[in-house]
Amino acid sequence: MKLTRKMVLSRAKASELHNVRKLNCWGSQLTDISICREMPSLEVITLSVNSVSTLEPVRSCRRLSELYLRRNRIPSLNELFYLKDLPHLRVLWLAENPCCGTSPHLYRMTVLRNLPHLQKLDNQAVTEEELTRALMEGDEITAAPHREGAGNGCPKPPYALNSVSSATETSQHLLSYTEETEVQGQTTTDQSPSFSPRDTMRSHKNRNILTAILLLLRELDTEGLETVQQTVGSRLQALHRPEPQEDME
């Protein structure tokens, strides 16, 4: 099913697409969200429990801060390429998609390496330690995924809430929907006060420097690594050395 202008305006209670800031399309059997290209003011969108297979339309939503895509058909983490230029994206829920693969650790590290500005991934807070590890343990995505044809996915949604679904499965969907909406409320009202603009800028600068250092370390031989180790040790000792206190007489 295609997300249409009429559906968007009705759900968002808006008169024009460019005015839409929040949109909830949870469990709507959607396969095509190309209309997102016409919503530059969009800040929060819920697309969980659908059959969306590409993130390309979302790349036009430059103000997007929260993206909920749990239980869709995102095939590959290469789709993250379309999110890398969204400067305000802080919350992403991508769990239960084919792109998550069989290694939860590699999945999380790869997402965080490519989207280091995230503060929450799959309803779990992102830590500075994770961001540092992601530089070494995550895969870097540098190109858009190759696509055959221009379709937005198969017409038969795997997670549609239809008559075939069992009562248990439906109740689980509804419970997860309630949980997801609660999370949205929390992130809207409490945007991690520990991240001040100055702290965020300093953190990004440190991460960029660390990335460069880690990449250069791969090129060093044993002798070079030993030199780096000695230099780092001396630097740490200097930083931890207590400053001399002046005598107060």
Curated annotation (Swiss-Prot):
Biased composition range(s): Polar residues: 162-175
Subcellular location: Cell projection, Cilium; Cytoplasm, Cytoskeleton, Cilium basal body; Mitochondrion; Cell projection, Cilium, Photoreceptor outer segment
Start-end of each LRR repeat: 19-40, 41-62, 63-84
UniProt keyword Mitochondrion present: yes
Organism superkingdom: Eukaryota
PROSITE patterns to which the protein is assigned, alphabetical: LRR (PS51450)
Residue span(s) of domain LRRCT: 97-137
Region of interest (Disordered), ranges: 146-203
Observed phenotype of the null mutant: Cilia absent or reduced, virtually no cilia of the normal 5 uM mean length.
Alphabetized UniProt keyword annotations: Cell projection, Cilium biogenesis/degradation, Cytoplasm, Cytoskeleton, DNA damage, Leucine-rich repeat, Mitochondrion, Repeat
InterPro entries to which the protein is assigned, alphabetical: Leu-rich_rpt (IPR001611), LRR_dom_sf (IPR032675)
Any single Gene Ontology cellular-component annotation: cytoplasm
Tissue specificity note: Expressed in the retina.
Gene Ontology biological process terms from the UniProt entry: cilium assembly; cytoskeleton organization; DNA damage response; regulation of cell shape; smoothened signaling pathway
Induction record: Up-regulated during cartilage differentiation.
Purpose: Plays a role in cilia formation and/or maintenance. Plays a role in the regulation of cell morphology and cytoskeletal organization. Involved in DNA damage repair.
Subunit structure, as described in the record: Found in a complex with CFAP410, NEK1 and SPATA7. Interacts with NEK1.
Record-given protein name: Cilia- and flagella-associated protein 410
Source organism (scientific name): Mus musculus (Mouse)
Classification lineage: Eukaryota, Metazoa, Chordata, Craniata, Vertebrata
